[in-house]
Every structure is written in structure tokens, then in C-alpha cells.
A protein has these predicted regions:
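Short charge-dense sequence patches
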Residues: 107-109, 191, 234
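N-terminal membrane-targeting/anchoring modules of bacterial envelope and secretion proteins
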Residues: 1-146, 150-158, 163-167, 319-326
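Alpha-helical transmembrane segments of multi-pass integral membrane proteins
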Residues: 54-116, 145, 151, 238-333, ...
């Protein structure tokens, strides 16, 4: 009936903004992250109509989106708790409006000039985030190819009897593509992810418990290759550092340091939000938590990617190299002076003995 369809739409909307639904006393929280990314891009696109207004006016999208989200979920949702989606309903328009304001700032020739290290920090943080996302997409694709047989077997167990059933099942899983990429990033960072509260999967641990009947979970690694996997993000971090040293080089070492710190803050913020959106709750007891451990995964990726990317430009900075050269020269000079004093002392002792 139309009322049932409206109730389903309200529940789905709450899921998109990260809210919780309750059925038979059990809480569920599953975020179709690809749809959330689409909403951010849609907000960014719609804000183009405000080009003639001050850039700060784009922030009015936040209360407008939030109130609309509350109304849709509160008036139509049957199982959802409308207030639980508040955080997502704030973050989606906020990210879109900040994106629009930043891009319009760059295009505005009359805007006051931004400090180069500030703009470089945002660009460097975006570069590190983009590299992490692309590498995670490749890792997720490799896992999908390797586990295709298991995923197909789980799909057959779902009993799809028609083409529409198959399209619905596959399409629903496509909406979780960023989620699977986040799980892949958490895995090769060494932190791992949970397929249940008692089942951790990481390069050194393979969970042994049963998994929910979701075809994508058939791509979960069945072996533990070892900690050597973490060298992949470390290499990516060093590569980002080399690129940043070439593209975002600053003349002052202090500005270079501040740029690296700002880039790390941007990277950590994006990764933490990404990992949080990839967590889910699909039931009670074992399925009360699934996904990456947000704090641990964010910390590991910071150490493996952001930290090398920040240190490489500092180590290779001309000021650093000059300081190292001066220190090395001072050490050599002191060594030569010590050798001369030692030789003089030996000559005096020899003269005294004679």
C-alpha cells in the first residue's frame, strides 16, 4: 500500500543518514555509503545556484537538510528512530557546502590570498585520502575476484528466483561499495575488521565464526598472510611524501611542517568519517557490531600513510639538508681537532721520555 511504501522510504532514509531502526526489540544500523556519497555530490551541485551570494550562505544548507531529514524520517518511518540520524543529516550537507565554498574560493580572483601552506595542506591531505581510496578500491576488487566462487555460492543460497530478485540483491550490495573499500583499507592496515563481535579478520588473524548470508562477505580473506601486508600502505605513504616534496614544497621549514600537520588532520578526519560510516549493526549478540575498528584503523593508517607523507618532505627539505651538512661538518672538524690534540700529546710524551 502507499502507506507501507512511505514507511519503507522513511526507514531507508534514516539508514542513509546513519540512523537506527528497531524491529522486534532489535536495533539495526546499516549505512548504504554510496548513496551518502551521491547526496554529498547532489548538495554540492545544487549549491551552484547560490553563486551570486556570499560563500557563507552555503552553510544554510545544513539546517535546511537537517530539518527536512527530521521531517521525512519522523513523519513516515515506521521502525526508524528519527533522532539517531542527526549526525549524518548534519555531516552530508556540511561536507557538500564546505566543498562548494572551498572550490568557489579558489575560483574567486577577488578573494584574499590564502597562505600557501594552508592551501597546500588541504591539497596534500586530499591527495593522501585519494591515494588511500584508490588503493582500497583495488584491494576490494582483488578480494572480489579471489572470493567470487564463495560469493556466488552465498548468492545462490538466497534463492533469487527471477532477474528482478538478482538485480535487487546485486544493486543493494553495490550501494555498499565504499563500505567494502573501507573494510579492505582496515584489513591491509593491520587493524582488521569484524564480521561479528567475536570474529576479527586481519593479516594475522582469520575469524572462524559463521558469517551473515551476504554475498559480499564471501570475499573475506580465508588466510592470514602476515604483517608484511602493512608495507603496502607504508610504500603508498612514502610515495605520497615524494610527490608532496616535489609539488607542495615550501621555502620555509616551519611552513613545510605546518603544511604536513594540516594535511594529516585532513587525512585523519576523512579516514575516521569513512571508517565510521562503514560500521554496522545487523542484529543482536554476535551481529551487534560489524566493520572496522574506527580508532585503531584510523591510527594505523595515519602512522603508515600520513606520517611518512609528512616526514619525507621534511627530511628532504633544503633547510634540513643544510643543517645536516653543517652538523656533519662540525663533527668532522671536532674529530680532526681531537686527532691533532692527541698527536701533539703523544709528541710531547715522546719528547719528555727522550
Amino acid at each position: 500500500t502507499p502507506r507501507d511504501a512511505l514507511a519503507l522510504g522513511g526507514d531507508l532514509w534514516v539508514a542513509v543518514v546513519g540512523g537506527t531502526s528497531v524491529a522486534d526489540g532489535v536495533s539495526y544500523r546499516v549505512i548504504p555509503t554510496l548513496f551518502g556519497v551521491f547526496l554529498v555530490m547532489l548538495v554540492r551541485l545544487l549549491l551552484r545556484t547560490t553563486t551570486g551570494f556570499p560563500r557563507s550562505s552555503a552553510l544554510f544548507a545544513v539546517p535546511g537538510f537537517l530539518l527536512t531529514s527530521w521531517f521525512l524520517s519522523g513523519a513516515s518511518g515506521s521502525h526508524s528512530q528519527w533522532w539517531t540520524g542527526t549526525l549524518g543529516a548534519i555531516l552530508i550537507p556540511l561536507i557538500g557546502s564546505i566543498w562548494f565554498a572551498a572550490s568557489s574560493y579558489v575560483r574567486d580572483s577577488e578573494a584574499p590570498s590564502m597562505q600557501h601552506w594552508i592551501s597546500g595542506g588541504f591539497k596534500m591531505g586530499g591527495l593522501m585520502s585519494l591515494v588511500t581510496v584508490v588503493a582500497s578500491a583495488v584491494a576490494a576488487l582483488v578480494a572480489l575476484v579471489a572470493g567470487w566462487g564463495r560469493a556466488s555460492g552465498i548468492h545462490e543460497l538466497l534463492g533469487a528466483s527471477s532477474m528482478m530478485d538478482t538485480i535487487f540483491i546485486v544493486g543493494g550490495q553495490v550501494l555498499f561499495a565504499p563500505t567494502m573499500m573501507a573494510w579492505a583499507a582496515a584489513w591491509w592496515s593491520g587493524a582488521g575488521f569484524m564480521t561479528a563481535t567475536d570474529s576479527l579478520h586481519s593479516p594475522t588473524v582469520v575469524g572462524t565464526g559463521p558469517i551473515p548470508p551476504i554475498p559480499l562477505l564471501g570475499t573475506v580473506p580465508e588466510t592470514a598472510p602476515g604483517n608484511w601486508v602493512v608495507f603496502v600502505p607504508v610504500v603508498l605513504g612514502i610515495a605520497c611524501g615524494v610527490a608532496s616534496a616535489r609539488v607542495y614544497r615550501r621555502s620555509h621549514l616551519l611552513h613545510q611542517s605546518a603544511q604536513g600537520v594540516l594535511a594529516s588532520v585532513v587525512f585523519v578526519s576523512i579516514v575516521a568519517l569513512w571508517m565510521w560510516s562503514a560500521t554496522m549493526s545487523m542484529g543482536s549478540v554476535r551481529l551487534a557490531f560489524m566493520g572496522p575498528l574506527v580508532g585503531r584503523s584510523t591510527l594505523y593508517l595515519f602512522v603508515e600513510i600520513a606520517l611518512p607523507a609528512m616526514l619525507v618532505p621534511l627530511v628532504t627539505h633544503p633547510t634540513t639538508l643544510a643543517l645536516v651538512g653543517q652538523s656533519a661538518g662540525r663533527v668532522r672538524s671536532e674529530g680532526e681537532a681531537m686527532r691533532r690534540r692527541h698527536a701533539e700529546r703523544l709528541s710531547r710524551e715522546a719528547a719528555t721520555a727522550s
